[in-house]
Amino acid sequence: MVAAGDQEHGRRGMTVAPVSLASASLFVACQTVDVSFSGDGAGAGSSGGLNWGQQHILGAIRNLGSSMNMCAVRELPPTAIVADFAEELRFYLNRFQAMRTLLRFSADHPPIQVVHATGTVPLQILDLAADADDAAASAALTALVAEHEQHSFDDEHEFPIRMVLIRRAGILTHLLTVLNHFATDGAGAFAMYEDFLNRDPVTGLARGPVPIHPLDLTAQQATAAGRRQSDASLRYWEKQLAALPTRRPTAAVPEPGSRYRRASLRSVPLLLGATRIAHRLDCDVSAVLLGLFATALARLTGEQQIAAQMLVSNRFRPGMANIVGNVSQSGLFVMDVADTTVDDVIERAQRAVTRTYKYAYFDLEQWKALLASVERERGEELALCYYNDRPSQRGGTAPGTQPSAETVAAAAAQTAPIVWTELPFFNERLMVTIDSPPDDDEAVTVLVSADSWHVPRKDMEELARTMESLAVAAACDPATLTGVAAVVEAAG
């Protein structure tokens, strides 16, 4: 329940001040245009609480201590004018409640989301020196993007979208759009832009109504049907976690250097091998990578049954495909990889991940309580590996042209280096991320992030290298085994 004062505040117009960053010193002038908006919906709805996806992303932002801002740079034609981008910003604000939502925090209650019907948002125009060369202009833009990536939004007072125009010698050259990740994920950002591109050319209005807003989703999840879905998901988690074998407790072992690290492997043979396997098994590349990950993790841990959390986009659910908001949550992936082929693991993984997706939709606070209860009963902390396949979150990962076994083997002969990055903090023991940029279709990048006091650097590298070597071996020989033996229980 939200206080009446907050509801009234949501109905009134609100002005947000422009953001001031250190990189502004690289520019010779700064101008601000206040863009007004007027959209449907206001206040906090019947409950004002956060929906499950919002709970998840806010928790991730807090745990990481990172803004997780999303930045996009658009190069502009010489004919671009400021008024066009004021209208674009107004379109997003008028149409999408997520872009005009602020949060209210209280020590006594969970966060509340408040939608504003009217208000203004600043559109900034930054001027480069007229005599700035291309190198200076590029450096200034790079610095601006880097600062906006790290400059957190004020969730209580700043609407979750910033637009900054770069001007050089009187000509607009670039648009930087910054989104607060709490407001939407990448798929939602693309949906916003698609709606803008497909608007009516005469009226400038969208061609249809918004299917659903985040506040609508909050109301849906509070219904009896929503509660049943959450309860079913939590029962699945409880059953699967209770069945996992207990592990021998291990103490943290400090390593020299930074405790939190990321190993990055950009692998051509991994993509080629996975593509060849995908053609053989008639599946997506993402399914192959999941099976390779499961096998590599089992080899590393020595456990025949692996359990991992997966980031699941719930956009496959009815009415949620194009929502501008966050609908991703953790799913639980469990499967056995012992005494079988890599091909078989990949096919099993496709069946297992269906359950993962089905039960990745639940009330986060109840989920936290369940995990705490399970850990008490088991007498150990459940530090599961996290797996995130970013390309599969953007859409399908159908394989490209089928490479020959010779092509895969030739690529494997060239060893790519592991690139190490020190992290200031990381909130998981171990996380594997498939991170293939849309403009890189020649390789797949595996990011292994970890607390190196629990997962040594050699194990981080081994995990990425094993995924690659398994892909090459299985691409060339369908009979390739996982190399994981079944554990035989002692009699008596």
Task: Write out the residue ranges for each language-model feature.
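A short, small/polar-residue-rich loop/turn motif at beta-strand boundaries
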Residues: 11-16, 28-45, 78-94, 112-157, ...
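His-Asp-centered acyl/peptidyl-transfer active-site segments
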Residues: 12, 62-70, 97-98, 157, ...
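Acyl-group handoff/entry surfaces in thioester-processing enzymes
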Residues: 37-38, 42-115, 134-222, 354-366
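Short amphipathic alpha-helices and their capping loops
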Residues: 2-63, 87-131, 159, 212-260
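Extended, hydrophobic beta-loop-alpha segments that form or line the acyl/peptidyl-thioester binding
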Residues: 96, 100, 190-194, 304-311, ...
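Structural preference for long, well-ordered alpha-helical segments in enzyme cores
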Residues: 20, 53-57, 81-99, 137-148, ...
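Gly/Ser/Thr-rich phosphate-binding loops and adjoining beta-strand/alpha-helix segments
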Residues: 30, 37-47, 64-84, 155-176, ...
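Acyl/amide activation-and-transfer machinery of modular secondary-metabolite enzymes
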Residues: 54-77, 106-132, 157-162, 172-173, ...
